[in-house]
Amino acid sequence: MKLYDNTTENGQNYRNPVLYMDYSDPDVIRVGEDYYMVASSFTYLPGVPLLHSRDLIHWEQLAWCVKKLPFARYDLPAHGCGTWAPAIRYHDGMFYVFIPLPDEGIFVTTAKNPAGPWSELHCIKQACGWIDPCPFWDDDGNAYMAHAYAKSRCGIKHRI
């Protein structure tokens, strides 16, 4: 069984995986000819890495979207907490990164340039268990967000 495949794309060879890092829960958008990716960083700070690529093969990190989490409890290690599965969007000349903190709610940070600077986190919905945001803007300009729910964040870990 091969773990890594050599692949050819437009005459260019590359080897999977193309990123030798743990970028959990990635979300990727395309703006023009550029691709941008964000990923979970949990309680590691700075947090929420933002990467850039023009070909989905070669990536470089541009920024960290979060300098500090807005709760004192994150000043200490907290396994399983912090930023989970962020979502990156581009709308009306602005980059948005929606960041769930599953014990606190959904937060957003914005920047005109993906390299930053990124705004301080702003809570858009205080909630327990909200994860995996999927925001979008409708044709009428209204913004909406679908999300998942982690029941384990509300005191139920397992049922036997």
Report the location of each language-model feature.
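Carbohydrate-active catalytic/glycan-binding domains of CAZyme proteins
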Residues: M1-I160
